[in-house]
């Protein structure tokens, strides 16, 4: 899925290959009705990090002023230094949790959730007030007059884990502060629903959800 370009003709592309026991192999198509929908970490920061860098690049080109990103180090780091969530996989192993489906969030929460629903032939309900949003991300989003929820739903490049688990694993997931339960799986006929903080229901769509609609 990688398309790489270089202004100087030099590219480094790395592929990692691993092994897994057959009974531990988790795909996208195993989500079951009533499973819990969960994510690791927080969402939307990488998109905002990109927004900061693009803004500072424009300022530098126009004025020559060097960017001061010290107070936005976390957000910029979310874009430039994504981390593989090996700690989450280790937590699963330690607590004997086997997700029914899982994938990383590269194109935004909405898009990845719809992938799981399609391949598992299920629907879902997600709750806005359950989405994990970092305070720095929210603060900067508001300063740019952006919706933090929309950044989480459609920003992408967060590389957190989106996964589903059986309800019997609820306590194990809830005990980890780095994991959030954001919804549940439904029958496919019930569709894919996003419920706002105000209780309004909207169809979950790949480009995210717009507060102004």
Q: What is each model feature region?
A:
Residues 1, 21-26, 87-88, 110-111, ...:
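Glycine-rich, charged/polar anion/phosphate-binding loops
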Residues 1-56, 184:
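Glycine-rich anion-binding loops of enzyme active sites
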Residues 5-12, 17, 94, 99-213:
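Glycine-/charge-enriched secondary-structure boundary and capping motifs
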Residues 18-21, 41-47, 54-57, 83, ...:
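Short, well-ordered alpha-helical segments in soluble proteins
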Residues 22-27, 60-65, 123-126, 172:
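Phosphate-handling active-site elements
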Residues 29, 40-42, 77-81, 102-105, ...:
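Glycine- and other small-residue-rich loops at beta-strand/loop junctions that grip anionic moieties
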Residues 49-69:
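Short, compositionally biased
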Residues 66-115:
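Polyanion-binding loop/helix "lid" in catalytic or ligand-binding cores
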